[in-house]
Amino acid sequence: MAQSAFMPPTYYCSFCGRNQDEVDRLVTGPGALFICNECIELLSAIIANEERKEAPHAPILPPTLPIPHAIRDHLDEYVIGQDRAKKVMAVAVYNHYKRLRAQAQGDTDVEIQKSNILLVGPTGSGKTLLAQTLARMLDVPFAIADATALTEAGYVGEDVETILLRLIQAADGDVDRAQMGILYIDEIDKIARKADNPSITRDVSGEGVQQALLKILEGGVVNVPPMPGRKHPQQEFIPFDTTNVLFICGGAFEGLEHHIAERMGSGGTLGFGKTIVKEERLERSKKLLSLVNPDDLLHFGFIPEFIGRMPVVAALTPLDKDAMMRILTEPRNAIIKQYQKMLALDHVQLEVSGDAMEAIVERALAGKTGARGLRTAVEEILLDVMFDLPSETDVVRCVITAETVRDGAMPTLIRRTSSRSRAGKQPTTKAS
């Protein structure tokens, strides 16, 4: 009796059999029945899927299919430079959805295989932004997965099938629509084989992941767990056909240009035997990456089967100073425009001098993180200002100069003239 008073009873989920210590929550029903939170989510997903089958479907394919020129023009609004990569992606995406439209209309006399895309380029060159912009333009489900988190099935890490769950979630659970979406796999270069020669230690996050990805890249029905994380035998998997999913893989592939240079005949020359000096390194890298071929990827550590499933390769070039300056101000989502809008919500006008922009670009280039470094630099410069502005209601303008960027001086804050001041008095200036 004493033991039962101090030891609470153990309750089990009537569906999966786990007790209250193994789940987040147990819900009590009539007749001593219990159901855990995970089984509730699973049953809700099953019911919602059945209801979707009975309800009218949203259009699976994009309602309109822009031509390659229109796709490239749209990309130009958001991504600076990378003209060759834009053209390659515009053609590949147009052909992919044109193929799906033909299939939907019953035109199947010739079987056209899909062309997945491999983006090769340094960090911050626009790989992810290109894929995101394409998906947003076409209004198709889009998801991003990180290849570094993937491991071969049976090992600690994320199974390759679970990345498809993100695409289902992006389609609001509509599996049919998700099967026509775009999945971007970032950091794909990190799953390269660790060495040219097979090791006695199993490479579960390198070649093992490449092997596991082959089926979903090629196209076929894959069983996707309805919830990420721990699996249990009672869960019902979601059949997912990847045949019509467009896979875009991207990676920095650091060091790849060295092998391309060796293949071209000399590590120090390119083209007409011209010696490449230090100041020409950026242009050299641009030219070399544009010459990447399957042999280079094989040497980098990718198995032939994986390379064969990524037939479209687009090289993105490193961003130079001029491109970085344009990224700051020209695109629709330009970084300076974003922060000007952010401060405008606090009724403050942000001004950035031309010299300050050059200094921001120099700081980003020194960090070697591409366009991402621009946002980091601006965020650091404006951190204190954005912290204080909501408390200082008399500030009307914030000015960033080159000294602010290079020397760490505080941005100049222009304050509103006090209502008690004489008419016509100029606003006071305060460096804070």
Swiss-Prot record:
GO cellular component, one term: HslUV protease complex
UniProt region (Disordered), positions on chain: 412-432
Gene3D superfamilies: 1.10.8.60, ClpX chaperone, C4-type zinc finger domain, P-loop containing nucleotide triphosphate hydrolases
Domain ClpX-type ZB: 1-55
CDD domains attached to this UniProt entry: RecA-like_ClpX
One MF annotation (Gene Ontology) recorded for this entry: ATP binding
Binding residues for ATP: 122-129
Keyword NADP: no
Protein residues bound to Zn(2+): 13, 16, 36, 39
Keyword annotations: ATP-binding, Chaperone, Metal-binding, Nucleotide-binding, Zinc
Assembly behavior: Component of the ClpX-ClpP complex. Forms a hexameric ring that, in the presence of ATP, binds to fourteen ClpP subunits assembled into a disk-like structure with a central cavity, resembling the structure of eukaryotic proteasomes.
Protein's name according to its UniProt entry: ATP-dependent Clp protease ATP-binding subunit ClpX
Organism (species): Herpetosiphon aurantiacus (strain ATCC 23779 / DSM 785 / 114-95)
